[in-house]
Regions:
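Bacterial N-terminal signal peptides that target proteins for export
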Residues: 1-8
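Sec-dependent N-terminal signal peptides of Gram-positive bacterial secreted proteins and lipoproteins
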Residues: 12-15
């Protein structure tokens, strides 16, 4: 299980009006791909959506017992921005460890529009690969993408999606990213009032989504978001493994 956007499948200031999104592969995108060109962004790096707040300096730590060992993910909101498709986005660093060894280091880009929707605009990815003795042998960048570009040379242009809607309602279905053949994560809102209990005994009332992608048709994930905190848990449907929030700072 890979946790990110954040937990994806193994997430200048001033008034900005977005220009047209380039066509994807010469065809139209599905209806579930949000219309980025119709959004406006007055303060895009001020991300205060209650289910996906990004306050600079906040760090979330998640853990999961997996078949491969202990997985730990550290998510940090950086005091950095990046311009994507003419919009400034907030940079979120996500580091994933397996048995205390760094296996992935990403920088995700998010922006909030004037309606309160949080957009996912892409990510830089460093994947760390080791030999059986634990020696680093290569760093790859599989999974990297940027809205408005074709970074993998696939002949298509990536489009941004919603990582969290402003007013989510059960049944809402939307793409979180749309880069044909490379990144096509989708989500559907299942419920707004699901109570979950973490291993440490903490209870949260959560927004629940079911995440999926046609690139991995046999996999479904449930994610749970608490107001004022963000993501608190993720699980693969049919698996006993669950990624859980263990700390949030400050």
């Amino acid at each position: 299980m890979r946790v990110a956007a954040w937990f994806a499948f193994c997430a200048g200031f001033g008034l900005t009006m977005v220009g047209c999104v380039p066509p994807v592969g010469g065809g139209s995108a599905p209806d579930t791909v949000p219309d980025f060109a119709a959004a406006s962004f007055a303060n895009p790096t001020e991300v205060d959506n209650p289910y996906f707040p990004l306050v600079v300096g906040t760090t979330w730590t998640y853990e999961a017992e997996t078949a491969d060992g202990m997985e730990r993910v550290v998510v940090e909101v950086l005091d950095e921005t990046r311009e994507v498709m003419g919009v400034q986005s907030r940079v979120v660093r996500v580091r994933e460890y397996l048995n205390d060894v760094l296996v992935e280091d990403t920088r995700d880009w998010h922006a909030q529009d004037d309606d309160g929707n949080v957009w996912y605009l892409g990510e830089e990815v460093d994947n760390y690969n080791y030999d059986p003795a634990g020696n680093l042998i290569e760093i790859t960048h599989e999974g990297a993408w940027e809205a408005g570009k074709d970074v993998a040379g696939l002949g298509v242009i990536a489009r941004p999606g919603h990582i969290m809607k402003a007013s989510p309602a059960p049944g809402d279905t939307y793409h979180q990213e749309y880069y044909v053949g490379e990144a096509e994560d989708e989500a559907v809102v299942v419920a707004l009032d699901v109570v979950i209990t973490l291993s440490n005994g903490t209870n949260y009332t959560c927004l629940q989504t079911r995440d999926f992608t046609r690139l991995e048709p046999g996999i479904r994930e449930h994610k749970y978001y608490a107001i004022g905190i963000g993501l608190v848990a993720e699980e693969v449907v049919g698996s006993t493994e669950r990624v859980e929030l263990v700390s949030i700072e400050p």
